[in-house]
Amino acid sequence: PQEVALADARKGINMYMNDKVNVPILGLVENMSWFTPAELPENKYYLFGKEGTKRLAEELHVPLLGQIPIVQSICENGDKGTPVALDENSVIGQAFLELARNVVAQTEKRNAELAPTQVVKTHK
């Protein structure tokens, strides 16, 4: 992602990790990681930079949960009402499947290693 997007993510994560807020971060997801044309599914074009989210995850000691590419079929299938993410044989389907697996794994790890998140009431 672009540097301004990384700066915004860094600010948000730092806010949530602050002792006064203390909201656990499961990890980062990079949307629009690269462009893959349908006719060349093995090709990746990094339109917004490469590995910025990976570097941010390493810097902040949080896992990179997934990278979601830009593919034209997302829009086309969305317009038809058939989410391409459900097609496990597609590039985007594989990306969402990996993301889902990583979210489950990090949630299980968080639940095993950290105390339950406390609910804070802000009003009566």
Residue ranges and their predicted role:
Residues G78-I92:
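C-terminal boundary of histidine-terminating zinc-finger modules
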